[in-house]
Structures are given as C-alpha cells and as structure tokens.
Amino acid sequence: MVVLSTLALVRAAYSLNSFVFEAEDIRFGSPWWFVVVGVACFLVLFAGIMSGLTLGLMSLGLVELEILQQSGSSAEKKQAAAILPVVKKQHQLLVTLLLCNAAAMEALPICLDKIFHPFVAVLLSVTFVLAFGEIIPQAICSRYGLAVGANFLWLVRILMIICYPIAYPIGKVLDAVIGHNDTLFRRAQLKALVSIHSQEAGKGGELTHEETMIISGALDLSQKTAEEAMTPIESTFSLDVNTKLDWETIGKILSRGHSRIPVYLGNPKNIIGLLLVKSLLTVRAETEAPVSSVSIRKIPRVPSDMPLYDILNEFQKGSSHMAAVVKVKDKDKKNNMQLLSNGETPKENMKFYQSSNLTAPLLKHESHDVVVDIDKVPKHVKNRGRNFQQNGTVTRDLPCLLEDNEDAEVIGIITLEDVFEELLQAEIVDETDVYIDVHKRVRVAAAAAAAVSSITRASPAEIQSKVGQTVKKLVGKEARGTKNYTTKITEPLLAESDR
C-alpha cells in the first residue's frame, strides 16, 4: 500500500500545473459529484471491512474455534460453528479478502481523481484508507473478531463465490506449498497456558494453585517413570517368607499401618509376593505361624523406565495396587529407546513392557484369590530352588527369583498412592506415616511427631490398654484374654523404646 501511494504521489507531482482544489471533469455540487463521493465512501468502508475480516478471521485458529464450539457460551458456540467451515479454507479465504481489499484501495484514487486534483485525491485516499480502512477496522476486529466475522459471514461467502476462479487455484497452490496451519499445543505450552490462568499469576485467571498443580502433574505423568516415584527397596518395610507371625511381628505390622506388605525370600531384593494385612485377622499369634502359611498374593513387576501413566492405567483395572520396580537390562533399554524413537504412544509401549522377560505383567482378569505357590518354581527362574534357614525354619525348594541376577534386581516398590502423589505433586501423609518424603528422609509435621513422643512417654499400663483395644478389634477376642495378648505384644515394644 505504501508503494502504491508513493507511485501515485510521483504521478501527481509530474502532472501538477497548479494547486487547484477542484478538477475540471465534475463540478462541485453537481449530481455526479455526490455520486462519486458516495462511491468513494463505499470503497473506503468496503476496504475497511475486508481489512478487518482479514485480521479477524485469519487470527482465529481451527483449534480455538473448536474449543469455543465445545466450551464457549451459547452465542460463541453458534458463531464458532458458523465460521469454522469457512476458516477451514484458509488460503482461499485469505486470497479472496486480499483481492477485494486491493481492488477497493486501487479504485479509490481513481474516483477521487474525478472530483479533486490528483495530488489532493492521493492525499485524501491515503488519509481515509489509513484511518477508516486499516486502523479502526483492525482495532475493532482484533477484539471482536468472532462476532464481526459471524455477522459478515454472508458477505464473505458471496465474495468467495465471485472470486472463486482466481482465489481457488491460488489457494490450492498455497495449500500444497505451505500446508495448513492446524498445529496443536505442546505439553510445555499447555503447562505455561495453565500457569498463566492461575490466580497467582495476577492476570485475572480463575484457576487455584492446587488446580494448576494437578493439571501440570497430569501432563507430566507420561513423562515420569516408575523409578522417580518408587520407594527404594532399602526404605521399604517387608517381611521374609519364613518370618514368624508372633506378637512382636504383628506389633511391627500394626505400628507401620500398611495395608500391603511385600514378602521376600532370603534377600530383601528378592520379592516373591505381597501380604494383605487384613488376611492376618484369622492368624493366632501364639501359634507363631510363618508368613508362608498365609495367602501370599502375586506382585506384578514393572520396569524402572515404565511411564507412570501406564502404571496408573494398570492399577485402575483393580488387579493390584502395588508393584515391584525391576531394574531394566541395557538390552531392553535400547529396545525401549528404539520404540520411543519410532513415535509410539505410551499405550503402544505397553506391548514392549508386557513382553519383557524381566517383568511379569500386571494381573488381568484374575480374582483376588490368586496366591503365590511358593513350592513351585517359575519357568523363567534360573535358580530353581535353594534351602534357607531363618528363625529356626528350613524352607523346602523355595524359589529365589532374582538373586545373583543384577540386571533384573528389584530396586523399589511403587503403589497407587505414589502415582497419586506424582499426579497431585504433593505428598499424601496419613496418621501412620513417619516420613513425608522417603527419599529425602523428611519427617512428618510436628503434631505427628508430638503424638509419637507422647506415646513413647506413656506408662506401660496405658500402652497395654491402647494396644489391647486394637488387638481385641483385630483378632475378635473377648476382654478376658486381652490382658495376656497385650503383655506379649507390648513387652518387645517397651524394650525397644527404652533403648
């Protein structure tokens, strides 16, 4: 536009003989003079509409229109639904609007040249086009582009039909060369968009800090791995399969407050299953039965680089809420990286994880009565069986699943709560937790610590009374036998607290 105006000024300078306000073709005040002025005003208005629609419609992306069509107000839904089919023809629409805008701006100086001197005509055309054909329309359409585009959609459709012979071929060429602009947001862009809409950003957003944290955690869930969220095996409370379920062991289980406890054989890294604490309700502590006498359920194994999103999907099936994290072999790591480089989604990667010889896939379509047969050695275990002597009990051909196999050792335990903590990006602390962050060894709040210290300072009679009530609820005994039970369970606890 600036180039055209410059050329017109040069042309006017060469043809200027005298500064006359009125041209000789059409006299001022004649009917034709008013007709030309009306045409000039129409051209300015038409050029302004085309300029505003170019900015308003082309600034509306397909993704934005689809969002408004689904989640906008009733008026926005109607407007977005009407505009979307037209905006999908991006390049044809662009060529149509630019052709009409250029035609109006080129015709304006010609009309004004009939009633004004060429120099005055160029000066007026540049002024009116800038003010009423560019600045004001684009300022309005940049703010109300959706509403303006919907109201002038009938005009746009007519112009697209008129300019079809020229706009359609050029639009197809642009589609082939440039392509369509329908890029979606990346994860980082979505997180930044959510953070901008938070109340803490101070930009009028309605999302609270907790809501933004949860949304960001959900976006990061497929990027985080099991190794990042697991509890290290060294910090995990577990039981040997030959441990006697006496009062001391039951007291430790009660003090931990876990609902599921991993069970190992010989080496704590040799996890063979898990024990549901509620299954101990029928166990009599005076019999000192080993853990192997209770139903030990299968514990699924997942590779350390498995995304938390896939683990959450498997936990949702209800087969298990605890899994053993296994160290991935270098060979399987390379295969996994090759799968990721091929652009496969996390769901497609599940095929790799489930077929890996390091892991046992999470239980599917199995009832909760499935237990581990500790007398049967799995086929994939190289060490068929070994004899262990612990607590005076000798095991018979119990499988050593992962011992002496450094590439497939269990390095941690992951639970559904761990995945939820990564989703919420905050630690979930209950009344039995000792540490908020197991990795950093950060203890719980002072209130919980004070409660623990108050129990430690309590008298033996008070401790026996409290533990007796708990044992009575668990084992279902009458009050007459509670005293003997509490004496047996509190003696080792008191001895340990005196240390």
UniProtKB/Swiss-Prot annotation:
It is found in: Membrane. It is a multi-pass membrane protein. Residues 1-32, 113-114, 167-499 are extracellular. This is Putative DUF21 domain-containing protein At1g03270. Residues 54-91, 136-145 are cytoplasmic. One of its GO terms (biological process) is magnesium ion homeostasis. Residues 29-211 form the CNNM transmembrane domain. The chain crosses the membrane at residues 33-53, 92-112, 115-135, 146-166. InterPro entries: ACDP, CBS_dom_sf, CNNM, Ion_transp-like_CBS. SUPFAM superfamilies: CBS-domain pair. The lineage of its organism: Eukaryota, Viridiplantae, Streptophyta, Embryophyta, Tracheophyta. Its main location: membrane. It comes from Arabidopsis thaliana. Disulfide bonds: none annotated. One of its GO terms (cellular component) is membrane. The keyword Ubl conjugation does not apply. Keywords: CBS domain, Glycoprotein, Membrane, Repeat, Transmembrane, Transmembrane helix. Gene3D superfamilies: CBS-domain. PROSITE patterns: CNNM. Residues 230-291, 295-359, 365-431 form the CBS domain. The keyword Transmembrane applies. Glycans are attached at residues 181, 357, 391, 484. It comes from the Eukaryota. Pfam families: CNNM.
